[in-house]
Amino acid sequence: MKPHCLLAHSIVLMLAGLLFVGAGTAAFGAAGPKAISPSIGAWLEDASAGEKIAIWVFFRDKGAYPQRDMEARILRAASSYDPRAVERRLRARPDRPFDKSDLPLYRPYLEALKAEGVEFRTFSKWLNAASIVADRAQTGRIADLPFVASLRRVSGRAGSPEPESLDAPTKEVGTLYLYGKSWRQLQQIQVLDLHNEGYTGTGVRVAIFDTGFWLAHETFSGLNLIAEHDFINNDSITANQPGDPAGQHDHGTMCLSLLAGQSPGKLMGAAFGAEYILAKTEDIADERPVEEDWWIAAAEWADSLGAQVISSSLCYSDWYTYADMDGQTAPITNAADRAALNGIVVVNAAGNSGAAPWRYIAAPADGDSVITLGSVDSLGVRSSFSSQGPTYDGRTKPTVMAMGQANYIADPSGASAYRRGSGTSFATPLAAGAIALLLEKHPGWLPGNVIEAITATGTRASNPDSLYGWGILQAYDASEYAPSGIASRDIRPSGLMVYPNPCLSSFSINLSATRGRGPLKIYDVSGRLLSELDLAPEGPTQVDLNAALPGVAPGIIFLEIPGSRGAKVLILR
C-alpha cells in the first residue's frame, strides 16, 4: 500500500491542534542580481544624509538546514496554530497544509540587519521579509548583503479612510422593526433571506483590519470576541489609547458595526452571530505614514487563529503605479493571495478614487484571489467615488458591489449614537458578513468556491465590466449555487468517523457495517507499516487508539480501513 493512495480520500483528525507535513519547496528569494524598486532608487539619489524611510527587505531563503531539521522546524511552527486554522488549511491545501512559508525568518539574517542599526517595524514569514526604517547609508549597505534578494518601499494607504457623511439614502425604501434603518443595506444583497433561514454567521471566524475599535458602543454588547491586537503599539488595546490621534478608532468602529452590530430596531450587522478577531493596523496621524506592513502582520496572525474571512476596508497605492496593480507586485497583494491559498476568504475595498486622477483599485484589491468590493447607492447605482478596474493585466475588477453610500452605521461619538456614511469601506463589511453566512451554510466551501458562487449569481453575471464587476452581490442566490469541485473536498466520508476532534492523547474510530474484511493498518509517511489491528468480522465497530502507538513518531500517520476510505491522522507529543 502506498500512502499517496490514501491522500486522495482522506479524513483528518487533529490531535491537540498540531500538524506536521513535509517541508515542501517554497521559494523565497530568487538568486541573481538584487531588485531595488524604482521608488527606492529615486529616493537613494535624492535623500539627505539623515532622512529615513520604511523599507521591505526580502531574503533569499530561510537558512540552510538539513531536511530532517527543516521538517522539525515546520512541525514546531504548525504547533502554534489554532485547531480551526489547521482544519481550514487541510481543506484548502490537503497535500501540503504547512511549508517553509510558515517558518519564522532566519535569525542570523535579522541579526545582520540589527548590526546596521536599523529600526524593525514588523516581519512577514509568508513574504520572507522584514520591514525596517533605514537611512540612505544603511539602505545601501543592506542592499549589498549576500542573503538579501530585493528591497521595496513600504506603501502607504490610498486616501483617507474617513467616510463622507450623508443625512439619508437616495431614497428611503422601508424598514422592518428588527433592522431599523439598516434594513435596505442588508436587503439589497439578500442577507435578510439568509437570516430568515437562521444563518447569522454562527461558528464562522471573521477578522477585520482597520484603525481600531470602540467596543463600548451599545451595538457591540453581544460581540463574540476571540482576540484583538494593536499592531501599531504592539499591545492588545484596539480602542483609542494615550498617544493616539483623536478619532483613531472611529473608522474601524463604524465598519465593525456593519458586520457585528446588534441593536434591534436600530442597526443589525450582516453576520452578528459570527466570531470576531480585531486587528488595529492603521495609524491615522497625518505626520506618520499609514503603511501596509501591519496589514500583512495581521493577516499572518489571523491565519494562525483560524480566521475564515478577512474584512479589510483599507487599500494602498503610495509608491505604486497602475502597472504595479497586476496581482503580483505589491507585497500586501501577495500576502492577501497567500491568505486565500491558506483557505481564508479575503474581502477588500476597491477604494474611493473613482473620480480622482488615480481612478483604479489599489492593493491588495488587485489580487486574483481577493474579493474586491465596489460601492452602489440604495437604488443599485454605482457611486461615483467607487474605484474601478481592470487590473493592469486585464482582469475584471471590482468583483461585486454592495451598498456603500449613505449606509446606516454606529457613530463612535456616543454609546447609543448612529449616523450615515459612505465609502467602499462600508460596502466591504456588508459583503464580508454575507460571505460569513455562506460559509455557515456551506462549511466546506473554499475561497475559490465562494468567488465562483458570487460571480455566477451577481446582478451582472452575464456581462461583467470594470465599473460594476459581476454586479451587486446576491448572497441568497450564491448560497443556492453549486460550485464545481465541492464533492472532492468532503473530508468526512460516510461509514467512517474519527473523534474527538481535536484530542490530546487518544482517539476512536467508528466504522459502519459496510466495510471489507481484514485488519486496520497504520502506516507512516514513508509507507512503512507500523501496526495492524484486528477488527470485528462484521457489523459496526468502534476502535479506541492511543496516540502513543509503538513506533509512531510525531507527525502524520495513515490509517487503511478495509473497504472504506483511508484516514490521515495528525499527531504531536
Protein language model regions, located:
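Subtilisin-like serine protease catalytic core
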Residues: 30, 48-50, 68-69, 150, ...
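C-terminal subdomain of the subtilisin-like protease fold in secreted/lumenal serine endopeptidases
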Residues: 183, 305, 309-311, 440-493, ...
